[in-house]
Amino acid sequence: MRILFNHNISGAADLIDLMRRAQPGLHVIATHERRDTPIALAADRLLPEPAETRLMSPDAYADWLLQVALAEGAELVLPYRRREELAGFRDWFSARGIRLLTASDSNTMGFLEEKPAFLSRMEAAGVPVTPFRRFEGADEYGRLRGEGELFPDHPGPLCVKPASGIYGAGFRIIRDELPAMTPLSGLSALELPDVAFQALLGALHRPEPMMLMPFLEGPERSVDFSCHEGRLLGTVTRIKAGTSQRLLHDTYGEELARFVAQTFRLTGILNLQTIEDTAGTQRLMEVNTRASGGIGMTGLTDVNLPALFLDSIAGVRSDLPARVTGEVQAGRRELFWGV
């Protein structure tokens, strides 16, 4: 099989390695803006994705990617960049004998990436979610804080994060008061005094939708899962443990992944995240319509999520989702190579 990836996060290199572990004859073509991407180590062929493609209209970009796929003889296209838009052009690709697979249609993916809307939908369905209040800009934030105790069931510090985004960009822990004589070096990069956060909001010319939440300090789980047309194929749960992560089977994580996949009829190697509150309840934080940056760690278990996905689109699947046996603790190190 010949697969084309467009511009992607570096974790796609691990995704490709896991696919090739199951299918050694796989031929992978990747387009990317940078020559120094780790994907260059995993792909058979790396092609430039010019920066100007960012400025293309949706149909122009879809046509550009289609022409690359045709020129390279790709049978399957798995997009990351502009995937929400590309979902609307799947018929263009299928008309030329190429499968373009996205997590869902454009509207559904957009909905899933908007955390407040998604969490409200899940809460209405009975799923425990992280409590939140949505706001935009300094004035709305100030009004929220003026309401007093916003989350009485979850006392303690508050935190904020953008309503959409990846890698925790924009996440901050808000400190209403700092201990006396606290030096700047005594704060983590994620901590902000409330007065500093309000000043920062006031300095921004374009406020973005954000979420104000209780800062829950329980175990955080990242559930990587593979699914095809709403059917769950397998899961691997990762629990952060200091500088390493524990990889194992989590029954609730599997149930949640199955529910999300079925509800939105999802396809792909995707990810969801939960965090425990003080009562030990796992609360859903978000779902990602892409593979996580930590997908490579799942290769240390006996469940190969990318392989399950490739098998399923070829018509080969099990009646039950694959489950990790045992537990693995994963560390990581930097990788260097000459470009």
Specify the residue positions occupied by each region the protein language model found:
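ATP-binding N-terminal substructure of ATP-dependent carboxylate-amine bond-forming enzymes
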Residues: 1-105
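Active-site nucleotide/adenylate-binding loops and adjacent lid/helix of ATP-dependent enzymes
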Residues: 109-209
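Short beta->alpha connector loops
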Residues: 8-12, 82-84, 135-140, 216-218
